[in-house]
Amino acid sequence: MIAGITLATLFAVTPTFAATNNQHQFNVDAGYTTLDNGHSSDQVFTTTVGYSYYFSPFMGVDLGYNGTMSSTAKLRDGNGNAIETKYDSFYGGIRAEAPVTRYATLYARGGFAYTQLEETNVSAVPETSSTHSGVNPYVSAGARVATGLNPNLEFTAEVSYQDLDKGYSSTSFSVGARFRM
């Protein structure tokens, strides 16, 4: 009975203990994404800004923004028309981590994102734009490495895949930094 109460108390305190041990993390990443619409693909600059809360040493939740911001991918549609495409994505999901060494950790994350995709047909006169939005899945895998400059600062590298609306997909590679609070 006492062992059961002790274990229950330990599990109840663990999220609070983890939160007080620098388990609030912020990240900023930059890289490139390959946007593909099934007819053509193009690479474009992408950025990610996010927040993670760890409810255990190896599991956490992610919230953030990922998108092409002002950059546009130059693609072709099914009729051969030149189109320019960009997207904004607000995501939420789960993160799982596995330490490899004292200084390096591998991680995987996944969840769902509300995505807004904008297509502009630049072959048309005048140009026509359409916007498509919806909730779509994403998955990512990456590594983070301690910097040695600051115990709360880490460098990251990540590969992500995200389904977008209207048959589009995004495959990204990014590098960045994470800061623990």
Give the positions of each predicted feature:
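Cleavable N-terminal export/targeting peptides
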Residues: M1-Q23
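Short glycine/proline- and aromatic-enriched beta-strand/turn motifs that initiate or cap beta-hairpins
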Residues: P15-V61, Y65-K74, A96
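Residues that define the transmembrane beta-barrel architecture of outer-membrane proteins
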Residues: N22-H24, Q43-T47, K86-F90, S133-V139, ...
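Repeated loop/turn-to-beta-strand initiation elements of outer-membrane beta-barrel proteins
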Residues: H24-V28, P57-L63, R102-L106, T147-A157
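Outer-membrane beta-barrel "beta-signal"
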Residues: Q25, A141, V145-T147, E154, ...
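Membrane-embedded beta-strands of outer-membrane beta-barrel proteins
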Residues: V28, V49, G92-I94, G110, ...
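Transmembrane beta-strands of outer-membrane beta-barrel pores
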Residues: A30-D36, F45, Y65-S71, A98, ...
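Outer-membrane beta-barrel translocator domains and adjoining extracellular loop/strand segments
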Residues: N37-F45, S71-G80, E118-E127, G167-F173
